[in-house]
Amino acid sequence: EAVISILPEIPEPDPSRPFHRNIRIEDNHFCSADYPILFATSVDGLTFSGNTIERSYDFRPWHPRKAGITVDACRNVTISGNEFIGEVLGRTVSVENMHRREVKIAPGSPYKVVWNKEAARPKLQK
């Protein structure tokens, strides 16, 4: 799904009960020819900060996913202090099946956030 993929082997992610916890991706240098850098599902306490993302031209982009970061059914997500070098692809964060309050993106972030319909409002409990 991405350079870093966090995909638990569970049948249906539940945003109220994430499978993984406390994952920090900090102070790395990514050199990618394609869009997705991080894809995370069902994580409570995900930090992506202080990373440098640089555009590579070694290959043509091939992945159908166009977001640089996708978070799905996660809680307590922080994205801050990242920088781009060159014409980096995937300058968006796609937020899926989450409430807005679960994602904190630092002011001045180079990322644009795209909320899906589920993220705009919390799921109703039955």
Which positions does each model-derived feature cover?
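Extracellular parallel beta-helix/beta-solenoid repeat domains
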Residues: 1-126
